[in-house]
């Protein structure tokens, strides 16, 4: 009888353990691990804790779009960070796949990593709303899923990002500062359609420039965060509209400015991303009237996401949404060897 009781107790304990794992992380009280690195988004951000696993871990990066310099730099940074002494001892295997802009293909790649027994998957989501089922599948398998950059419209998963709406707001506020009459024609060069970063920056920018009292005419084009595409669509916009008073570029800022130069368009205020080539042009063309604000998404988000995934696997208390500061440099502070190379 005692034997059967012990067996029943063991089965019950195993069932509870499995259920807890299947339910995903527990919601716990903060503060979390290393708040200097893993800063909670607000004081209302909740905290997660996963059951601790023994390392080293199998970690995957499920990337989507790979067609611009930012993504290429991000992937190189991920590989480099995985090889650092800090991470090398914690990682048994690190694999990267890029599936393009197809939502189903990216979800399938995440499912494949889950089914293959990976411990954590970091991802730049192609779509912010389509991932609820795969979050449940990751939780059921005890896999830590960490979206970053293009994050999800969900509070059920740990995420890492900069404030994209705030970044769009900063674009708009800076532009109005340099166009004090609050009127004129603005060119808005958007990013990759369907992504949360593109959506949130657009919303933040429009909220400022379309506020009561402003009388801007806004021409919107899609540059896909890519220099070549941005250069073409800006050239086409200049050919049609002839003159703009200001331009904001979510990505591909170097190409966008080159289009203005090639068209012999007067230099105007440009709020763009943090690409090195853009900053170099801002410094070189300042004498011609090019006034720039360079702020944007750091490819270093991938390293923070990898570090967060490992901390979560170790059972550390983690914020559900981790806030990363926005790097920014603006005219006249562009300096070779300091903030561009």
Locate predicted features.
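Flexible loop/hinge segments that line or gate small-molecule binding clefts
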Residues: 128-166, 276-288
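Hydrophobic alpha-helical segments within soluble ligand-binding/sensing domains
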Residues: 37-46, 106, 160-186, 200, ...
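Short beta-strand elements in bilobed, periplasmic/extracellular small-molecule ligand-binding domains
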Residues: 84-99, 185-188, 209-228
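Extracytoplasmic "Venus flytrap"
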Residues: 31-52, 56-77, 81, 85, ...
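An alpha-beta-alpha
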Residues: 59-63, 67, 78-79, 171-220, ...
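Short, low-complexity disordered leader/linker segments with a strong preference
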Residues: 1-56, 114-115, 136-143
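Hydrophobic alpha-helical
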Residues: 111, 115, 119-140, 205, ...
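Hinge/cleft segment of the Venus flytrap/periplasmic-binding protein
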Residues: 24-57, 209, 297-341
